[in-house]
A protein has these predicted regions:
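Positively charged n-region of N-terminal signal peptides that target proteins for export
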Residues: 1-4
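C-terminal motif of bacterial Sec signal peptides marking the signal peptidase cleavage site
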Residues: 15-16
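Alpha-mannosidase-like glycoside hydrolase catalytic domains involved in N-glycan trimming
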Residues: 20-121, 125-126, 133
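Solvent-exposed beta-strand/loop surfaces of large extracellular or lumenal domains
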Residues: 49-70, 240, 284-302, 319-329
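Beta-strand-rich recognition/accessory modules
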Residues: 64-76, 317-392
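Solvent-exposed N-terminal domain segments of exported/luminal and surface proteins
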Residues: 88-212
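Extended, loop-rich substrate-binding clefts of extracytoplasmic carbohydrate-active enzymes
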Residues: 180-255
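Acidic (Asp/Glu-rich), glycine- and aromatic
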Residues: 248, 260-291
């Protein structure tokens, strides 16, 4: 009995010594936000888990140690405070996943054809056909996106018919049985366009986009898979662009409850004064709205080259640029509606993009014009500032 008592006392002392830190954060928004994405920075290096509460109720959250950030989503009308507790003890709580990220290496083994990877790199432009769905992909319940691991690094879109996670089952290419069960599918052919929301180089004299062809190393990464946000990155080192050797990391983040994506481009080296472009592609039967800091288009085209199998799809795309982004011009090319941008003093260009799809059940009652104005409004709302400040 004495031995048991001593053991219990030792366990109690161990529990009492577990390191933790409780903070209070205030989140402020300009307009009401459902599933407002909140990111807490300056996470303690020793933290292994996080718990977030609002009005005493625990909210799903995640700790992304590779970024030293914690993230959660919550409904915020105007101003709301949250209790954030960091602990050195790993979490035993599993929240229902609302986001996913994945990248699959083709093994060549018929029994196990794909191996999931979080990081892949190459010194050549040879990865496009070595990866299933050609690069990393992220999804929420409302949409999915992949980035091509090639010289274009274009974003491609996957529409959802129902609000659900499904990429780990469909693997981007839904089977006839899955389509019959209400799965979504690839709904866009990007050709040589900007697609939606990727950052590319720009040749001002030729008035055309520049792909990443001359480089030293390129890497694709999955940084976070959920439950409340998923993150993928594409990094290029030693890119010979406009007579300079630079580096660029493009980070794409999708949050639970959102179809919009946050894009953060981090540029390194001698990038002052360089021009880059982003925007949305033009499509057949297109309608568009182009404003000073946001552009949207809706069009109809076949998502694949097999026209008999894949009928035309109606897709609306939008990009919105926050006030802090420096816009040099807004000159389009033949395939895309574009903005010419330059990085800020820290070498960063940040913006948001979004997609609407005619076959999404929650959008089926909208006209084409309403799909267009809705996707533009969502992208612009996503680009509004969300202020997160520690108050205790």
């Amino acid at each position: 009995m004495k031995k048991i008592v001593l053991m219990c006392a030792a366990v109690a002392m161990l529990c009492a010594c577990t390191k933790s830190e409780e903070r209070t954060y205030r989140v402020t928004v300009e307009h009401p936000h459902k599933d407002c994405p909140v990111v807490v920075t300056e996470v303690p290096a020793w933290a292994e888990s996080v718990v977030v509460k609002a009005d005493g109720v625990e909210l799903p959250s995640q700790l992304d140690k590779c970024l030293a950030e914690a993230a959660f989503v919550a409904d915020v009308e105007s101003v709301k405070e949250f209790e954030v507790i960091f602990s050195e003890k790993p979490s035993t709580t599993e929240y229902a996943p609302r986001t996913n990220a994945q990248m699959w290496w083709k093994t060549g083994d018929e029994a196990n054809p794909y191996e999931e990877k979080d990081t892949l790199y190459s010194f050549k432009d040879d990865m496009y056909r070595k990866l299933h769905h050609h690069g990393p992909a992220i999804e929420s319940e409302w949409g999915a996106y992949r980035v091509y691991f090639d010289k274009k690094q274009t974003i491609d879109t996957y529409g959802k018919k129902k609000g659900q996670l499904e990429l780990r089952e469909s693997m981007w290419y839904s089977t006839p049985e899955q389509l019959s069960a209400g799965f979504g599918h690839d709904n866009l052919r990007v050709f040589g366009s900007i697609g939606v929301g990727v950052l590319k180089g720009w040749d001002a004299e030729e008035k055309k986009m520049i792909h990443i062809t001359d480089f030293e190393r390129r890497e694709a990464r999955v940084l976070a898979k959920g439950p409340v946000r998923a993150i993928m990155e594409m990094e290029v080192e030693g890119w010979n662009y406009a007579g300079r050797k630079i580096g660029m990391t493009s980070r794409y983040t999708i949050f639970a409850g959102h179809s919009d994506v946050v894009v953060e481009n981090f540029l390194e080296g001698d990038v002052e004064g360089l021009t880059f472009v982003t925007g949305v592609m033009k499509m057949l039967d297109t309608q568009s709205i182009k404003e000073e800091r946001a552009v949207a288009q809706i069009g109809c085209d076949h998502p694949e080259n097999d026209y008999t199998k894949w009928p035309k799809e109606t897709v609306a795309l939008a990009v919105a640029l926050p006030e802090e982004v420096e816009i040099l011009s807004a000159e389009d090319d033949q395939l895309s509606y574009l903005y010419q941008l330059t990085p800020n003093a820290e070498g960063v260009i940040k913006y948001h993009f979004d997609m609407n799809w005619r076959k999404s059940e929650w959008l089926s009652s909208l006209s084409d014009e309403e799909l267009l104005t809705d996707v533009l409004a969502k992208a612009k709302a996503a680009a509004e500032p969300i202020v997160v400040e520690r108050v205790k």
